[in-house]
Amino acid sequence: SSGIGYALCEEYLKQGWNVIGLARDGTKIPNKTIDNPKFEFVKTDLSNFDSSKLIIDEVFKKNANISTFILNAGIYIPDSLNDFNFENAKATFDTNVLSIYLSIELIKKNFELNSNYTLAIMSSTAGYKGLPKSILYGPSKAALINLAEAIKSEMHDNLNVKLICPGFVETPATKVNSFKMPYLMSPKEAARIIYSKIYKKGFEI
């Protein structure tokens, strides 16, 4: 409903796609998007696995021709070694990692693995190296990098697997950072770059 996720919805709508957007809060989404006949908003908290499983399953059953899945759920809690706690760690991994596994399980259930579709997993360059205030976020994104690479190693012929690792993007998450963020870009620009590469050859964006 914000950041890169919302910007991707807007980019896909601009390119003429029908878009289904899942988020826990739709109040941030502008009316121009909500009112777009090509856009459907589905409210669900992906860290609530039981309810999300039912909701996503129903979405997939009603939309048998989905051709692109962008798994973008994520939260950023800026914790360091001195102030992190287990509750924040669990919240981070529930949303950033386990909800992605849940989504993949439901994709497998409703769509043939050899179907011609794109499966994109949103990680981050923070997954490659530890950063300040990223003792929770960084490891969760590192897990997604490994997950995408593992899926790619089992690549099915018609499955286009993409690993997306944005750098620093202007979002509520990066606003709390006090360190220098090189090559900082807008969500709109990040979405444009992602869309321009997601259907081309290559694994990582």
Task: For each feature predicted by the language model, list its residue ranges.
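C-terminal helical subdomain
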Residues: L163-I164, F179-I205
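Canonical Rossmann dinucleotide-binding motif of NAD(H)/NADP(H)-dependent dehydrogenases/reductases
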Residues: S1-N18
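Active-site helix of classical SDR
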Residues: I104, S140
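Substrate-binding pocket helix/loop in short-chain dehydrogenase/reductase
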Residues: S80-L81, N85-F93
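Active-site loop immediately N-terminal to the catalytic Tyr-X3-Lys motif
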Residues: N82, K129-I135
